[in-house]
């Protein structure tokens, strides 16, 4: 078979450009352009279920918690708190008994998830001071509520040198109080590098079964099991922080009501 001539060899392309059909699958290891880590983590979030990998279809959590029935109900709490170094607490499982889409039918319901939206900010005088302040958030489940109001931050948590960043539940209260989620946000004051406010946007799946007594009012004192509390405290001793939050809980009524 005759060989190719020299001019044919030169005119023949060395390599052909192939088009890769890669649909951003998380299972392929490739040298891609640097992207934001959060975008890569949520790459399959907004796609239909049939277009997601089998891992997302097999291990999908049920829409309705076990022992509950629909529809999914929503309760919102709008509040503005003065977060101090000693801490504040809010009960986020207060639901009135009734027949509406924001009410509980009976004594028992399950809070499937919670959505915390808002910001922490400083006023005009505090933000001019050169300091850094962090707000610690503790989403706590009170398994055996007692009294007319929740216990204070210092009564529940044990801290070293009264520092909220080292807060842990006291040993004698560990069977009653359970920290389900913990997060923080940072604000910075001063003439340079100032960050006077910090946005909050957190969504947690908790699946907490709350039990009330025979009363209809949405109060902490009417809880008998699993009250959901949000503790907040700032790390700076002299400069408080303001928290403007909108908290939404998504819950289902229990079948045994």
Swiss-Prot record:
**Where does it live in the cell?**
Virion
Organism of provenance: Tomato yellow leaf curl Sardinia virus
Instruction: Kindly provide the name given to this protein in its UniProt entry.
Output: Capsid protein
Similarity section: Belongs to the geminiviridae capsid protein family.
What GO molecular function annotation could you give as one example from this UniProt entry?
structural molecule activity
Q: Which UniProt keywords apply?
A: Capsid protein, T=1 icosahedral capsid protein, Viral penetration into host nucleus, Virion, Virus entry into host cell
Q: Which Gene3D superfamilies match?
A: 2.60.120.20
The lineage's top-level taxon is Viruses
